[in-house]
């Protein structure tokens, strides 16, 4: 008997207390009162109503709205009917302060701080041009988030966070430990800061959130390494997703559209995100923009119908691979400000200006891209303002005054240029003071394959078809022009391979092959 009693005592001591459910307002008048009474593992279940309080969670507890998975107008219906009202004053406390291992599930959090519609509209109208660099940013002086995660691992899910005076959901990391909270399935809009803000070495998983009409980015990260997956960010005053100050996020599978600036914006030295498989469209600036010495990897994204470039780089060092840029109102891919880029295996189709523009002293290695535009005056590829480009093994279809314009230095080799229509201009137009080596390309359907004046030129080993009159035209070269080993194929018996005015270098082994009516060479 004594042994049996001893066993029962041992079981009682070793078995943890069963988790309890504390109900608000049935058992506790306020959410905070229920939280204070809860133990790790307990759930605070909150019924529909408006609760005018700001709360601080305890480790290991779940605070959840009562209800099921029924969807309402903005999010879950239960989140729409259980409202945490911060009182509309600035104060010193966030709307919700998360704790280690805690969960916040299914609330509307609003009125934390002072939301000013006039301030929001002013910055929306100016595209955030007058917005201070830290205004509304996580960890800026005086930041009071609606939901604050201070160097703890926790879960924030199914919430609606809106009309707050600062950032919606803020995550701050620590140099002493990994901070990897889960931020999922939330709706964050009309906050006077970012929708979700991440700073100071935090590494959260941010997925399946909808962030719109926030004063800064829908999702912003600085000096952090979050995983930003499958979110929808639209109509934000700045970028849909923004990263800066050495951030190294993975940004994957997001939709960013109709933002007042870029769909995804990357800036500052040391900032090196992987930006992949996103869809960025109808943004007021670039689909994906990067600048100021940032070093992003930009791959397999779709960028279309943006008001500036599909992908725009200003003074940065991107790797741009496998993207599709369509119908943007400026360039498909644009470089300026001494940018240095590798541009490989992209598809740029029907962009209003150039498919690829390399300007303002930039440098680019451009390989294995498909570049298409029907109609329009601008060239498909422009190397301008003393820029440098290596252009190899690309497929180019169409063009305006030229398929490719060179006002700088370019090596053009192994490409396939195909004109579209009888009024097609030159394939490669080399401007005064430029330097070009044009080798082993296939040109079909342009007025001339090469038209160069007052430049330094080497043209060799090219095949030229369906040109008009003169295949290669060189005028007044700054140094002797070398043109050799080129083959022109034409039905015109008067066709000429090379026409040079001015100083000649090596001009040899250029051949015209006359084409019969049946298309065969004679």
Q: What residues fall within each predicted segment?
A:
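Acidic Gly/Asp/Thr-rich repetitive segments characteristic of extracellular carbohydrate-active
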Residues: 20-52
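Right-handed parallel beta-helix
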Residues: 103-215, 220-223
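All-beta strand scaffolds that present successive hydrophobic residues in beta-strands
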Residues: 63-64, 103-106, 126-131, 154-157, ...
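Extracellular beta-strand solenoid repeats
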Residues: 45, 56, 64, 85, ...
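Short glycine/acidic-rich loop motifs that flank beta-strands on beta-rich extracellular proteins
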Residues: 51-57, 87-95, 113-120, 143-145, ...
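Right-handed parallel beta-helix/beta-spiral solenoid domain characteristic of secreted/periplasmic
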Residues: 20, 26, 61-138, 521-522
